[in-house]
């Protein structure tokens, strides 16, 4: 089975920014990485308009089935008081559970300078393909139909018809 990927985009209200980042780094990421099947977790600052989800998190999974495991569901359904406070205050929250389709079982590039999340059809433009290493994911929940996560090596033009989210290490 292919690896899975969980993508989240979150944004706290401005007055909670410091607390939100402390919670994410000190509690949330270690908690998720302690769940069997979570392979890696990285946070990114997204280059988006206010209210669209300032922070992108990428969680690589052994498989998409990790998100239905008893260990994951226990954490998801029993959040800590700090998790309830921080997530409950978010002005933006988006979540995608995906199956990695390309290149299958490859892991994340540990030195990616940035990532680009493209929602929609996979771009065919030559300059995009030359600028990035792409991994494509199918969303089993049906929306968006395809998500492509690019690890950027060079500036990337915005292909027509796609919603693009650029993100940089936090």
Predicted regions and their residues:
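Macromolecular interaction modules
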Residues: 1-170
């Amino acid at each position: 089975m292919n690896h899975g990927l969980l993508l989240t985009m979150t944004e706290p209200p401005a007055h909670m920014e410091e607390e939100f980042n402390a919670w994410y780094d000190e509690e949330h990421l270690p908690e998720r990485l302690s769940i069997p099947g979570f392979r890696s977790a990285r946070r990114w600052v997204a280059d988006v308009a206010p209210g669209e989800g300032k922070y992108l998190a990428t969680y690589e999974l052994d498989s998409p089935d990790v998100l239905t495991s008893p260990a994951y569901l226990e954490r998801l359904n029993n959040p800590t008081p700090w998790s309830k406070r921080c997530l409950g205050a978010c002005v933006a929250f988006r979540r995608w559970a995906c199956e990695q389709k390309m290149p299958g079982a490859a892991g994340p590039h540990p030195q990616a300078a940035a990532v680009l999340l493209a929602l929609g059809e996979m771009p065919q433009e030559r300059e995009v393909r030359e600028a990035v290493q792409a991994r494509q994911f199918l969303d089993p929940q049906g929306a968006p139909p395809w998500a492509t996560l690019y690890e950027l090596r060079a500036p990337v033009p915005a292909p027509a018809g796609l919603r693009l989210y650029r993100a940089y290490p936090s």
